[in-house]
């Protein structure tokens, strides 16, 4: 008997594929409002500073393919079939749902490549996927709200952080601090009771505990260029503050809200934060991003299988 096919909808933010895509990509992010030329030029300069266009597109596709492969290795009951849906560039989330529907997929598990829940991020992806499926009359989509607390995800980061601290001489370690960060969001999410900031705090606490790190702080990065207040402190300001007030001279940055090498990490951390550490005479460290690391892919696969099992349990 043929195995049942289950769709695997992997959703991510998306990134420009080539320089010509930058304008339309950021216009989509800005809800159809074209960015000023000055902003486009600045973005092009940032991409060039990290060696050309972001590697994110290739990494996202590789993560999705590896996840599909791992899921089909881990169990033999269903055949997972992967569909990639992006938020701000093709293939859009709606395109992926349409393809699932056209292929006759009846049910799918959806996972967003972002560990923490927020109405701005995971919620908006899931709503778009469900709305598209509803419009077409299928498939049924089982969404995942968050997965930051999956043990293998925390293990990935705590092992990487521990390795950096372990390699330091004792004196340096005493003056080193871990900065755990995620993408900043508008402050108004707090008034709405969004769990996003608390989830990042929880992630930082668990990683620090597992890595045996006593000095750590939570920061935010890559805030949008809008007049409204965004979550802070920004990682650059936090770096200066920790140096000035507590005398730290080594900084280990763990941008755990992201899962791959891309502009926010390769520029905002590896260029901007590094410049700050150089200005204050401190050392800069940043663990490797998860990308397609087998432990990270295992974490995602475990989350997907748990979600499918939960659906099965509820129908028994």
UniProtKB/Swiss-Prot annotation:
**One MF annotation (Gene Ontology) recorded for this entry:** ferrochelatase activity
Q: Give the keywords, sorted.
A: Cytoplasm, Heme biosynthesis, Iron, Lyase, Metal-binding, Porphyrin biosynthesis
Q: Which residues bind Fe-coproporphyrin III?
A: 13, 30, 46-47, 54, 125
GO biological process terms, semicolon-separated: heme biosynthetic process
**Keyword Isomerase part of the UniProt annotation:** no
Q: Which residues bind Fe(2+)?
A: 183, 264
- EC number, as in UniProt: 4.99.1.9
Reaction catalysed? Fe-coproporphyrin III + 2 H(+) = coproporphyrin III + Fe(2+)
Q: Which Pfam families match?
A: Ferrochelatase
Q: Which residues form the signal peptide?
A: none
Q: Which GO terms describe its cellular component?
A: cytoplasm
Checking CDD domains in the record gives:
Ferrochelatase_C, Ferrochelatase_N
**Which PROSITE patterns does its entry note?**
FERROCHELATASE
Q: Where in the cell is it found?
A: Cytoplasm
Cystine crosslinks: none
What family name appears in the similarity comment? Answer: Belongs to the ferrochelatase family.
Q: What is this protein called?
A: Coproporphyrin III ferrochelatase
Which species does this protein come from? Answer: Geobacillus thermodenitrificans (strain NG80-2)
């Amino acid at each position: 008997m043929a195995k049942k096919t289950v769709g695997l909808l992997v959703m991510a933010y998306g990134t420009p594929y080539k320089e010509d895509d930058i304008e339309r990509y950021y216009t989509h992010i800005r809800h159809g409002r074209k960015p000023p030329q000055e902003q486009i030029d600045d973005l092009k300069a940032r991409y060039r500073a990290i060696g050309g266009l972001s590697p994110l597109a290739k990494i996202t596709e590789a993560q999705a393919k590896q996840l599909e492969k791992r899921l089909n290795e881990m169990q033999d009951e269903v055949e997972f079939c992967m569909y990639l849906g992006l938020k701000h560039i093709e293939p859009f989330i709606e395109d992926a749902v349409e393809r699932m529907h056209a292929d006759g997929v009846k049910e799918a598990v959806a996972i967003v490549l972002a560990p923490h829940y927020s109405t701005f991020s995971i919620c908006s992806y899931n709503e778009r996927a469900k709305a598209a499926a509803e419009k077409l009359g299928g498939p049924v989509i089982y969404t995942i709200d968050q997965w930051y607390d999956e043990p293998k995800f925390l293990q990935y980061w705590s092992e990487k952080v521990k390795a950096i601290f372990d390699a330091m001489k004792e004196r340096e370690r005493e003056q080193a601090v871990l900065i755990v960060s995620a993408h900043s969001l508008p402050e108004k999410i707090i008034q709405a009771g969004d769990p996003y900031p608390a989830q990042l705090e929880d992630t930082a606490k668990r990683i620090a505990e597992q890595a045996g790190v006593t000095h750590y702080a939570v920061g935010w990065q890559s805030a949008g260029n809008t007049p409204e207040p965004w979550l802070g402190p920004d990682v650059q300001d936090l770096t200066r503050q920790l140096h000035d007030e507590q005398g730290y001279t080594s900084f280990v940055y763990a941008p755990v809200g992201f899962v791959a090498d891309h502009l926010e990490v390769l520029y905002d951390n590896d260029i901007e934060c590094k410049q700050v550490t150089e200005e204050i005479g401190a050392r800069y460290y940043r663990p490797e991003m998860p990308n397609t690391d087998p432990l990270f892919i295992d974490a995602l696969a475990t989350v997907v299988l748990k979600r499918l099992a939960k659906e099965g349990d509820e129908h028994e």
